């Protein structure tokens, strides 16, 4: 067969592979992302025109009309070699700090200022983007109600937010839409449902249904415009093969959103157009939109119209290219899942599971993230398909989620049994129900290290000296000797935390109410809105079946180890307790012997009774307190023990702590031991982690294992993945009996090798791409800032994951 694509729709794998290389090369040359600004400008003009018309529309309809203007006016392109129409590039700016080489822990201030994005666009007079034009748009939106509401939300937080005792933010993205009905039937039935809803309801619900109909029609406009563009390009195309490809794009883009898909190609094209519309609606920077089980979504179309497996792999690689935004993959933390089981324990692996895994392995790009659902009955063939990821240096390594533990956790959250298999990951590791759950996942962030510091110093910051928390007297401590024993300090810690949590709750809810000023009727149609008649962001009623707000909790092992150190000093050298507050304020300067005693105290991660019990107690106590907070819907905040590189940022604002950690050093990552503190090897580390109450971590948690490349090869000759299962996955997840966790990700490399790569990148990585993980997402190690590169190297922490370790109980 020739290297061609026929009018009837045959694809040639070799051509598809070459086209993908061309697309990736074009991405690498895309150093400007200006579409988001043009979207803001289109919205500005549309809003000004609406106001000039003197027609008073409800806000949800206003937002639908602004979305319509964007879909109708934004410039569309089909680049050379693209076989699908659609992009999410225009939704993102060159903003995400952790993949920006200019990122500095010392100066990062979060994403709470919606006007900060305008600092991420460089004026380009040759493109018509003058500084004056940028400022005009920025100034317009700075005076709109949303920006004003956010400023008011942050106005009362002061030093407690500036020094991150807690942090709050408005949440965009971080959602898993259910596009399956639109893929199968098209948008016309949804439009009919919206129209019927408007006829059957009055008031706010009628307004929503009217807005939904407008927004769904706007998405059809995108498909129609691409169809027209592709048809016009086909008329001018001399190459018959490319002409045929453009004609296919024109035909499919023009009809698939109306009638639904019947082939794998059509399903992918429909998905891309829907994804584009969803991203445009929340531009700029809707981070962590995620897909769910892509294998289950696409399997019906693979079965319905048979194609060669190799063609399916290459088409999937083309689909994955949607998630590669610009030269640094700026659309961060977009997650795709495969695998898993149903509620009866039956494995749900299908042909598309293996096709998607193969596509990811061949492409090996920083985005999107890949997560694999596993369980005790996961087939050996799935593990065999995963092995290449783990034995290839610089290859992405999927994260694992344990259905056997997650299903009971979902039950505790109040999720109906039939919805358990629908859980998906919104971004890094937060489990949500596809199409049914709005969790506002990154709404609040809690810094236990700072809470401990404020407790130790009577409410004053060890960094700035500012009064932030409760005083010694309010905590019931003696100002002359506040640290007398562990029990007293622990009680004071809880009291300090209880004093700050209501303030965090209020600030987080203010951000959520601000977001309600920007309804998203298009996405809401795929999140239960057509059933409820309520926008996903509406705080006056609940639009999704499941709703919560998130709280990401930092500093578990720092606090546990610090309390253990206080207890150890109490037992061995009680006179040192009187000296400890001054030593901490001095960053242990001049008292190195005291610091060494603190460092030598028992540490979480070594299977030692005291710190392990303290860690479990902290998880339970903090989680229950966070769960007791309420969002604007009256639903709980879900405790999420995840620290998406923020363990660096939050540690920078924490002074020295009794575990021996110096001021401004990073906190521990997620639920992992502090770097360098788990010295007894992997088995004791896992035993420590088994003591944690995972069922209290209703919002998720983060955990990372850094493995030396040769470690598991030395464990046996049965293959790397077999050894990984036997020595790591099965015991960690409880597949061999006992309790277990439900999430882990790996980096398989050595600190020495990564430092060599940094020293000689062109020689050792000629492709310029070397994939590692930071929290729940892949990154190109060479694109990162020095601070993040060093964090990855430090947390490989080989001594904590060596297989031969002594387990002991103190």
Regions found by a protein language model. Name each.
Residues 2-212, 241-809:
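Conserved catalytic cores of very large enzyme subunits
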Residues 223-231, 295-299:
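Extended amphipathic alpha-helical scaffold segments
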Residues 210-221:
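Extended non-globular scaffold/tether segments
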Residues 230-246:
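Short, Lys/Glu-rich amphipathic helical modules
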């Amino acid at each position: 067969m020739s290297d061609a694509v026929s009018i009837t729709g045959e694809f040639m794998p070799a051509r598809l592979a070459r086209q993908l290389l061309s697309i990736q090369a074009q991405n690498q040359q895309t150093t400007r992302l200006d579409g988001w600004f043009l979207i803001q400008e289109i919205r500005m003009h549309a809003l000004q025109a609406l106001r000039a018309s003197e027609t008073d529309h409800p806000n949800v309809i206003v937002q639908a009309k602004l979305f319509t203007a964007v879909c109708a006016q934004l410039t569309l392109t089909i680049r050379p070699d693209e076989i699908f129409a659609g992009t999410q590039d225009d939704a993102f700016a060159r903003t995400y700090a952790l993949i920006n080489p200019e990122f500095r822990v010392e100066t990062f201030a979060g994403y709470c200022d919606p006007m900060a994005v305008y600092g991420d666009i460089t004026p380009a007079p040759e493109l018509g983007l003058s500084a004056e034009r940028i400022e005009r748009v920025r100034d317009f939106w700075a005076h709109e109600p949303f920006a004003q509401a956010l400023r008011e939300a942050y106005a009362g937080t002061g030093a407690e937010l500036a020094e991150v005792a807690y942090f709050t933010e408005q949440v965009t993205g971080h959602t898993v839409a259910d596009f399956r009905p639109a893929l199968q039937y098209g948008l016309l039935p949804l439009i009919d449902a919206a129209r019927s809803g408007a006829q059957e309801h009055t008031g706010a619900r009628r307004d929503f249904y009217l807005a939904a109909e407008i927004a769904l029609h706007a998405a059809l406009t995108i498909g129609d415009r691409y169809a027209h563009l592709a048809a016009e390009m086909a008329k001018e195309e001399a190459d018959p093969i490319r002409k045929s490809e453009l004609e296919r794009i024109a035909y499919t883009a023009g009809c698939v959103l109306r009638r639904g898909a019947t082939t794998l190609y059509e399903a992918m094209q429909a998905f891309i157009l829907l994804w584009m519309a969803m991203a445009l609606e929340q531009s700029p920077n809707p981070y962590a939109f995620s897909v769910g089980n892509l294998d289950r979504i696409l399997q019906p179309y693979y079965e319905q119209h048979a194609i060669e497996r190799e063609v399916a792999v290459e088409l999937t690689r083309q689909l994955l290219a949607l998630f590669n935004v610009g030269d640094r993959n700026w659309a961060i933390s977009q997650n795709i899942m495969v695998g898993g089981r149903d509620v009866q324990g039956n494995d749900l692996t299908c042909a598309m599971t293996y096709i998607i895994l193969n596509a990811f392995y061949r492409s090996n790009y920083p985005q999107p993230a890949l997560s694999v659902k596993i369980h005790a009955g996961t087939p050996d063939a799935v593990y065999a398909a995963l092995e290449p990821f783990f034995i290839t240096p610089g290859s992405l390594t999927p994260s694992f989620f344990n259905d056997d533990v997650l299903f009971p956790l979902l039950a505790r959250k109040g999720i109906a049994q039939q919805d358990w298999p629908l859980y998906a990951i919104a971004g890094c590791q937060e489990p949500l129900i596809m199409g049914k759950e709005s969790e506002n996942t990154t709404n609040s962030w809690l810094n236990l290290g700072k809470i401990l510091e404020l407790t130790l110093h009577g409410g004053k910051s060890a960094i700035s000296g500012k009064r932030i928390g409760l005083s010694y007297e309010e905590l019931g401590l003696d100002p002359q000797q506040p640290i007398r024993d562990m029990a007293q300090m622990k009680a004071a810690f809880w009291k300090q935390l209880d004093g700050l949590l209501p303030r965090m709750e209020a600030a987080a809810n203010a951000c959520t109410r601000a977001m309600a000023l920007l309804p998203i009727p298009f996405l809401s149609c795929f999140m239960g809105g057509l059933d409820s008649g309520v926008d996903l962001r509406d705080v006056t009623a609940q639009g999704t079946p499941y709703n919560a707000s998130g709280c990401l909790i930092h500093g578990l092992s720092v606090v546990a180890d610090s309390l253990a150190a206080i207890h150890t000093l109490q037992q061995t050298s009680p006179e040192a307790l009187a000296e400890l507050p001054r030593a901490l304020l001095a960053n242990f300067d001049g008292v190195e012997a005291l610091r060494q005693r603190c460092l030598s105290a028992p540490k979480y991660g070594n299977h030692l009774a005291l710190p392990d019990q303290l860690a479990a107690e902290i998880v339970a106590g903090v989680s229950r307190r966070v769960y007791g907070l309420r969002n604007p819907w009256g639903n709980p905040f879900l405790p999420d023990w995840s620290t998406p590189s923020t363990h660096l940022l939050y540690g920078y604002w924490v002074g020295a702590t009794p575990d021996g950690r110096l001021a401004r050093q990073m906190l521990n990552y997620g639920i992992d031991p502090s770097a360098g503190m788990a010295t007894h090897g992997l088995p004791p580390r896992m035993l420590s982690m088994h003591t944690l109450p995972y069922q209290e971590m209703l919002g998720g948690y983060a955990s990372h294992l850094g493995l030396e490349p040769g470690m598991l090869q030395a464990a046996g000759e049965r293959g790397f993945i077999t050894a990984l299962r036997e020595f790591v996955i099965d015991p960690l997840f409880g597949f061999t009996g006992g309790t277990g966790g439900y999430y882990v990700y790996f980096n398989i490399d050595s600190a020495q090798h990564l430092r060599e790569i940094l020293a000689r990148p062109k020689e050792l990585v000629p492709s310029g791409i070397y994939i590692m993980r930071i929290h729940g997402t892949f990154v190109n190690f060479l694109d990162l800032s020095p601070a993040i590169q060093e964090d990855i190297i430090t947390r490989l922490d080989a001594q904590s994951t060596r297989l031969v370790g002594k387990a002991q109980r103190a």
